[in-house]
Amino acid sequence: MLKELAENQFSFLGFYERRVKRILPALYFVITACIFSGWFLLDPFELKELSQSIFATSIFSSNVYFYLKHGYFDVSSELKPLLHTWSLGVEEQFYLIFPISLFLLLKLGRGFAVAIYVILFLFSLLLASSLVEENSAFAFYMLPTRAWEL
């Protein structure tokens, strides 16, 4: 992306199209498998939970859903087949914000953009470190505390 921006060849449409082609086929396969197996294996309450997590996963917000509803290491986590998609939610939220912010910040200068991202990186790392004890679920699931890893 940086190379494309430097060469004035970056396309938001192309960037997001590549993400869609890379992520959606496998995601749709997993969701379809969960629907099919859930129909036969889960009781009505668990099926309702599955449908909610499918919706959240479909709009790339499963990290928020699982943060609000469950803990990653709950006893019943084996009954949440889409629990692992929390990281996909974080990644896609990052992909929504990063290209646009990078494009805008580079208009103010490369040094300025680098400085802002260093500050945001450090803020994210410090926030994650400080919340591990107080709110470990937020520190685990949410973009502000995971952005430094991306």
Label for each model-derived stretch:
Residues 1-150:
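Membrane-interface helix/loop caps of multi-pass membrane proteins
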